[in-house]
Amino acid sequence: MKKITFLTLVEVVEIHSDQIQHYGGSEGIRDMNLLSSAVAMPYVSFSGRFLHSDLYEMAAAYAFHICQNHPFVDGNKRTALASALIFLELNGVSISDSQGKLDEAVVSLASGDVNKVDFAKILRELR
């Protein structure tokens, strides 16, 4: 299996800052522990195997846990989606979303109407 490039805590904070600068809102981390937890979830493993089985599930883990943990003062959904997409891009996966399905999907993810597994399926469909 090809080595997977995961996002670091610093990179996710930079992604958040970029989202706020481009689209507005308040900068700041509301809870560093929740942010650290969210960023760690995609690469959690047990007995030498990742709990998230592929890149799409790992990307969905970034999106889901950043949305659910709400670690930033503002821009959590934007940061969640951007982190998932950047993670995929870093690992050679391009997503094409000409109809804007991901914006709606991340709002549904944050509200609990879409779960992590469903979000991973959406990402797979848009590759």
Residue ranges of predicted features:
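FIC/Doc superfamily catalytic core
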Residues: M1-R127
